[in-house]
Amino acid sequence: MNSAVEQQLAELGIEAYLKEHQYKSLLRFLTCGSVDDGKSTLIGRLLHDSKQIYADQLDAVHADSQRVGTTGERPDLALLVDGLQAEREQGITIDVAYRYFSTQKRKFIIADTPGHEQYTRNMATGASTCNVAVILIDARKGVLDQTRRHSYIANLLGIRHFIVAVNKMDLVEYSQSRFEEIKEEYLAFSKKLNNPNLDISILPLSALEGDNVVNPSEALSWYQGEPLLEVLENVDIDADKGNGEFRFPVQYVNRPNLDFRGFAGTVSSGGISVGDEIVALPSGKKSKVARIVTFDGDLTSAQAGQAVTLTLEDEIDISRGDLLVKSQSNLQATDQFKAEIVWMTEKGLEPGRQYDIKIAGKKTVGQIDAIHHQVNINSLEKFDTQELPLNGIGLCDVSLTETVSLDRYQDCADTGGFIFIDRLTNVTVGAGMIQNLSDLSETKPINDNISAFEIELNALIRKHFPHWETQDISKLLG
């Protein structure tokens, strides 16, 4: 059994242990950085030194280390998270691997993301749900292109807490001057991200030797800060959750019998209390919250991150994909917006092609009208392009076939983030973060040579024959 869990069970008993564990705060973090910076080894070290590995897992790692390990006689702790056969054979991470562990203070979900450039899309997927980014830097190599790329994507995805871990300090003889040099280089780069709200901590460690990961290290006696695990335990993410206006995307209409009709979902931002007046969008109908229902009983209020079922005083038409907000909300409804897009498939993004677009619980249809620029992740310079390639990131104009209530991504990730789905293959091909909402009062000039019938026929063809890749004629008018 996991030795840490076994000890707590012996001290508390099963019921007290489960109760204590249930109410611990949850932190989601990812490890990212360039190839061979030691991301998987760091996670393995965290699990090992915090006594979160079961005996049979450790035995399996010892056995596998003799066959495919890279650490000589010692167990290769990276094998705890590199589970795919290709990953073990090549000694790299390909897919996003998730691991779970807890300490006395907090529960953790770790996303171990790949460092290779061709798997950048996997890194973006892992980062999309995280609160903290642990960015690894090889002390021998310093800040690399992929370090900058992952930092840019993490910032783009709204992660506000960066922990920069300068790894492999044992290979530079635990040099303080080398650490300070890398620290200065990274802080200079971080200023280009133009985010004054970024919380950046920088610390030295050696994942292979276990220096400054869970426990302080004598070899790093010149470093006066906390080891990595303590930094993770003390990151304050509660302030981030409670900010913003109330947003509640409806995921499911719960009607177990004729006497109950509730709307299930997770509070995306802000908070709600019994008696608050809400508006259902897009219908605009108002009501008041009658109950906030959970498995453990009713609540008087709910905050961001809580999964609840809301019942209302009035019977109004609400379905999956609708959005509940407070009546005084100034949420904007639009069918056009600008978004930063990360493209995730071999076939490049081309303006004019239609895709299914999923925002929160709602699915609609849209297209890219124009690509303003692509970002050079290494230099953060912007350049013109006609097509967004695999792993490309760019600012684009997006239009939908219907009006949808949206937020900017920085205000609410759930109602400001979306994915592109290929209409033929159902493959997720891209992800977007809304930056600016367009003013619907801006209208395009009408071309009298195009009849209403032709516009309707064009819309019909685009809806039922997407493989023809017909452009939206209404966007070409004028």
From Swiss-Prot:
Keywords: ATP-binding, GTP-binding, Nucleotide-binding, Nucleotidyltransferase, Transferase. Residues 33-40 are annotated as: G1. Residues 91-95 are annotated as: G2. Its EC number is 2.7.7.4. One of its GO terms (biological process) is hydrogen sulfide biosynthetic process. GTP binds at residues 33-40, 112-116, 167-170. Residues 167-170 are annotated as: G4. SUPFAM superfamilies: EF-Tu/eEF-1alpha/eIF2-gamma C-terminal domain (SSF50465), P-loop containing nucleoside triphosphate hydrolases (SSF52540), Translation proteins (SSF50447). It comes from the Bacteria. Residues 206-208 are annotated as: G5. It is an enzyme of class 2 (transferase). Residues 24-240 form the tr-type G domain. Pathway: Sulfur metabolism; hydrogen sulfide biosynthesis; sulfite from sulfate: step 1/3. PANTHER family: TRANSLATION FACTOR (PTHR23115). With CysD forms the ATP sulfurylase (ATPS) that catalyzes the adenylation of sulfate producing adenosine 5'-phosphosulfate (APS) and diphosphate, the first enzymatic step in sulfur assimilation pathway. APS synthesis involves the formation of a high-energy phosphoric-sulfuric acid anhydride bond driven by GTP hydrolysis by CysN coupled to ATP hydrolysis by CysD. NCBIfam families: CysN, PRK05124.1. This is Sulfate adenylyltransferase subunit 1. It comes from Aliivibrio fischeri (strain MJ11) (Vibrio fischeri). The gene is cysN.
